[in-house]
Amino acid sequence: MTPFNPIDHPHRRYNPLTGQWVLVSPHRAKRPWQGAQETPSQQMLPAHDPDCFLCAGNTRVTGDKNPDYKGTYVFTNDFAALMADTPDAPDSHDPLMRCQSARGTSRVICFSPDHSKTLPELSLPALTEIVRTWQTQTAELGKTYPWVQVFENKGAAMGCSNPHPHGQVWANSFLPNEAEREDRLQKAYFAEQRSPMLVDYVQRELADGSRTVVETEHWLAVVPYWAAWPFETLLLPKTHVLRITDLSDEQRDSLALALKKLTSRYDNLFQCSFPYSMGWHGAPFNGEENAHWQLHAHFYPPLLRSATVRKFMVGYEMLAETQRDLTAEQAAERLRAVSDIHFRESGV
């Protein structure tokens, strides 16, 4: 029998953060594609759009007027998914019809007044201000809620309803599914190994290097060994950090650089504004020590072969198990092969 080769043969990889397996089918990477294709926007956006609900000085759909902001701008979402004053749900003893109240708040974070510039096109000082805003919002909301979720949906392909570069922060009175699962599995690993899972993982990736995409003094971005999306990345501090609020000034500044380099490589891969959903996971604000936690950011981009061909999580993946064609190592190699200077800045 031919010896096993992970570049040629189907195999499964285990995700210790979710407890789930991913089917890797590298032999399928060369299959022809005649399916749906995305149409990337070629529109050059203005620095200010008078019809945009998020631009500085404009009036939002509710009639509220945005200030003439110069940096980041945060406001409560006009169509928030959560409310702080939700009444208690009635007790239910039916194991098949369980319900509980959900309280919280949802805020919008405009990254800058410039309607045309996404994260990789912003300056390092502007990116540093965004990180500081993530920190202050997390610290403020963490005083009231156990879970604070900072995230960004970039691009229409990821359901973004407004092209003005922005993110969101939702605070929950409960621990959401993904957070609860990561909490439980990191805690189990810590109990067995006596060290945080993702701190150990960073050391493995630093020693290996084959999945590294970006490295700065204090941060490492890798295509994780267990990646599900084609060019998924995991962004991690090199030392033990529980929450984004715990970063030193040096780690914060280094994070701004890592974000610029990583998102520039994404855009450069297919010479387009690369869509993704990203977000931060850190220790919950539950009054516990949480030494098993390690701060990290997930980037989930859907593009697969080009700016027009995306991956769909359907069929087998919805009903059985996540599957990918490119190996994590091949995806990281492709991201390393492009510049970390944005193609619009380099003049390419």
From Swiss-Prot:
One record GO biological process: galactose catabolic process via UDP-galactose, Leloir pathway
User: Active-site positions, per UniProt?
Assistant: H166 (tele-ump-histidine intermediate)
Reaction catalysed by this enzyme: alpha-D-galactose 1-phosphate + UDP-alpha-D-glucose = alpha-D-glucose 1-phosphate + UDP-alpha-D-galactose
Question: How does the cofactor bind to this protein, according to its record?
Answer: Binds 1 zinc ion per subunit. Zinc binding seems to play a structural role.
Q: What is its EC number?
A: 2.7.7.12
Protein's pathway: Carbohydrate metabolism; galactose metabolism
- Residues recorded as binding Fe cation, renumbered to this chain, are E182, H281, H296, H298
What does the record give as cofactor? Zn(2+)
Binding positions (UDP-alpha-D-glucose): 28-31, 61, 77-78, 153, 159-161, 168, 311-312, 316-317, 323
Q: Could you tell me one molecular function GO term of this UniProt entry?
A: zinc ion binding
Instruction: List cellular component terms (GO).
Output: cytoplasm
Positions bound to Zn(2+) = C52, C55, H115, H164
Q: Which UniProt keywords apply?
A: Carbohydrate metabolism, Galactose metabolism, Iron, Metal-binding, Nucleotidyltransferase, Transferase, Zinc
Which EC class, in a word?
Answer: transferase
- NCBIfam families given for it? galT_1, PRK11720.1
Q: Which family does it belong to?
A: Belongs to the galactose-1-phosphate uridylyltransferase type 1 family.
Could you identify this protein by its name? Galactose-1-phosphate uridylyltransferase
Organism ancestry: Bacteria, Pseudomonadati, Pseudomonadota, Gammaproteobacteria, Enterobacterales
